[in-house]
């Protein structure tokens, strides 16, 4: 089952995934440690300035979703994720997939080349081709898709990939498409309302939204089956 995260939840989960691999001696993490990780000035996009109360509120929501769990330390409460590869979780990812998903949660849409360079503390990709293969796998998994390929921006050599763990993905893509249309209209013939890049971007957004709706239908069907079983009992 694919999780639906808001921006703060994505940041917290991303930080837990990152620190579990890069600084295992500091994992599970305290509220203070998580707040510092969420607000890092490097390796984060956008840079956030979350208060401890905001991070705590996010942790409370994630606890209710069973995406993290808490444990009492010597002096403070500590938290670890149940986002993937946990004993009772549905999502299972390889180390390469975890690295890619973590960077996408922490920094948003990125190219395969950027991901290969930035994941080196979590996983050492042999080359860009291996990174692209990992992204392809994540986009085609039966329990996904977990990433979506965006239309290549004019003048760019590589397309960027975006994570599909947010309900706002489709609207973000469409907004980007509208911005592309505005720029194109200013530079080209005013009668042209869509560029090829914009059409491709809107198509990607619609495909992403359809995939999200399909997952929601599956989840609702499972819940309905559980209710019917309880009624039969």
From Swiss-Prot:
Belongs to the UPF0502 family. Pfam families: DUF480 (PF04337). InterPro entries: DUF480, WH-like_DNA-bd_sf, WH_DNA-bd_sf. NCBIfam families: PRK11239.1 (NF008413). This is UPF0502 protein YPTS_2082. It comes from the Bacteria.
């Amino acid at each position: 089952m694919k999780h639906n995260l808001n921006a703060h939840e994505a940041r917290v989960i991303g930080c837990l995934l990152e620190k579990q691999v890069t600084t295992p001696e500091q994992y599970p993490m305290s509220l203070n440690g998580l707040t510092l990780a969420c607000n890092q000035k490097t390796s984060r996009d956008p840079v956030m300035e979350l208060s401890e109360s905001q991070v705590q509120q996010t942790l409370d929501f994630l606890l209710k979703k069973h995406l993290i769990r808490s444990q009492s330390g010597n002096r403070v409460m500590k938290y670890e994720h149940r986002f993937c590869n946990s004993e009772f979780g549905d999502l299972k990812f390889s180390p390469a997939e975890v690295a890619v998903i973590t960077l996408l949660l922490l920094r948003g849409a990125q190219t395969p080349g950027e991901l290969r360079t930035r994941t080196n503390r979590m996983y050492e990709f042999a080359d860009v081709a291996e990174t692209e293969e990992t992204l392809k796998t994540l986009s085609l998994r039966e329990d996904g898709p977990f990433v979506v390929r965006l239309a290549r921006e004019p003048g760019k050599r590589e397309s960027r990939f975006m994570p599909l763990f947010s309900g706002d993905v489709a609207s973000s893509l469409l907004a980007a498409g509208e911005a592309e249309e505005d720029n194109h209209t200013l530079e080209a013939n005013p009668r042209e309302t869509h560029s090829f890049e914009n059409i491709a971007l809107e198509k990607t957004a619609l495909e992403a939204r359809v995939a999200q709706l399909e997952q929601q239908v599956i989840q609702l069907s499972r819940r309905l089956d559980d209710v019917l079983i309880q009624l039969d009992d």
